[in-house]
Regions:
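Pre-recognition alpha-helix immediately N-terminal to the DNA-recognition helix
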Residues: 1-2
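Phosphate-coordinating loops and pocket residues in cytosolic domains that bind phosphorylated ligands
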Residues: 5, 28, 52
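Short helix-to-turn junction characteristic of helix-turn-helix DNA-binding domains
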Residues: 7-11, 50
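Recognition helix of helix-turn-helix DNA-binding domains
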Residues: 10-45
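A generic structural signal for secondary-structure junctions
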Residues: 39, 51-52
Length: 56
């Protein structure tokens, strides 16, 4: 949910990676998994769905 929270704050993958101290590729993988698990196709819809489900 930390990555979702940062996505909701408008952070890019690179900014999230820097914030968490991991590689940008790691964040890309996590974002891809988040989109898949939420059943959405883009970051905006993922954030909206996360709010609907009260994940953030």
């Amino acid at each position: 949910t930390e990555i979702l929270r940062l996505m909701a704050s408008g952070f890019s993958n690179k900014e999230i990676a820097n914030s968490l101290g991991v590689a940008e590729g790691t964040i890309k993988n996590h974002v891809s998994n988040i989109l898949s698990k939420l059943g959405v196709r883009d970051r905006t819809r993922a954030v909206l769905k996360a709010f609907e489900l009260q994940l953030v």
